[in-house]
A protein has these predicted regions:
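Single conserved hydrophobic/aromatic residue that forms the stacking wall/gate
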Residues: 1-10, 14
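N-terminal alpha-helical segment
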Residues: 6, 130-133, 242
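Core alpha/beta nucleotide-donor-binding catalytic domains of modification enzymes
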Residues: 11, 17-82
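Short glycine/serine/threonine/alanine-rich loop segments
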Residues: 15-17, 55, 117, 155, ...
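Short secondary-structure boundary segments
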Residues: 62, 93, 212-214
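Classical nucleotidyltransferase
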Residues: 69-176, 200, 257-261, 267, ...
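Phosphate/ribose-recognition catalytic cores of enzymes acting on nucleotide-derived substrates
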Residues: 166-287
């Protein structure tokens, strides 16, 4: 997950050479336990982030049984120095790699001279004495505290996805056409509820109100989804890939007694979003 620490690591890269981020295509925890491990940033989202911050290459190395059992020395020699021809390696102080995570920054340092690379170990960035980490960010997302999570990430928490057909209740019954995306099961979603959002469609940012959850008022069994009312957007966007960035928590998801009551609540949600943007005009202006 690309939080502030990794952004600082990127800044250490030498710009007269191509830059690359090395990661695994599948989270190691998923491969080891056989159970899907949720992630703050999916592979699709990571690729978009890398492009935004100017990384030349993103290596999503397959985490196979062979990779899992590779000795750390072989990982450094054969993959980092051998296949990737690394000349500058940037890591955190607690990095681990190789079989049973036995590889460390100390090992990288010990092998640097023989393999011809320079090692940069970047100390962890802290927030009020606590290390900024994926665990910390997940805790804030579970509380619905996206503003804090965004501060830790160094950018808005975002959900990417293709706009799919929903139940059309937003447009037909409520008069609020919405864009529905279904995130993959591995995507770590925040606390269910309504958020002020910023939505990227065809390179243009729009104000939005986003519901994360299972639509309890509608009834039936629905997977957790992301449904967004986009201010000022006209036209059909079904099938398009959009990015929904969450900016502020409005309220928890709740079940209403009627669609009329839901409609009234959505009007208040829109007012809440407009008030947020009046106080934070830069969130649209900066794009």
């Amino acid at each position: 997950d690309l939080h502030k620490e990794y952004r600082r690591q990127r800044q250490m890269c030498i710009r007269d050479s191509p830059t690359a981020i090395f990661t695994f295509g599948t989270a190691p925890g998923t491969a080891v336990t056989g159970k899907p491990q949720t992630v703050i940033t999916t592979n699709l989202e990571r690729r978009a982030n890398m492009e935004k911050v100017g990384i030349d290459y993103l290596v999503e190395y397959p985490f196979t049984e062979e990779t899992r059992h590779m000795e750390p020395e072989a990982f450094v020699k054969d993959i980092l120095a051998g296949r990737m021809h690394a000349r500058e390696i940037v890591v955190g102080p607690d990095c681990s790699f190789g079989y049973k995570g036995a590889g460390s920054a100390e090992l990288l340092s010990a092998m640097a001279r023989d393999l011809g690379y320079h090692l940069h170990v970047i100390e962890k960035e802290k927030d009020h004495r606590r290390d900024i980490s994926s665990t910390y960010i997940r805790e804030e997302l579970e509380k619905g505290n996206v503003e804090k999570a965004n501060q830790l990430l160094g950018q808005p928490y975002a959900i990417h996805g293709e706009v799919v057909h929903g139940n059309h209740i937003g447009g037909s019954l409520l008069g609020f056409p919405t864009a529905n995306i279904l995130p993959p099961p591995i995507k770590r979603l925040p606390r269910y509820g309504v958020y002020v959002s910023r939505v990227l469609v065809d390179g243009v940012y729009y104000k939005g109100v986003t519901n994360i959850g299972k639509k309890p008022t509608v009834g039936g069994e629905y997977p957790a989804g992301v449904e967004t009312y986009i201010f000022g957007l006209e036209g059909d966007i079904y099938g398009k890939n959009i990015e929904v960035q969450l900016l502020a928590f409005d309220r928890p998801e709740q079940k209403f007694t009627s669609f009329e009551e839901l409609k009234e609540r959505i009007e208040k949600d829109k007012e809440f979003a407009n008030a947020y943007y009046e106080n934070h005009p830069e969130m649209i202006a900066q794009g």
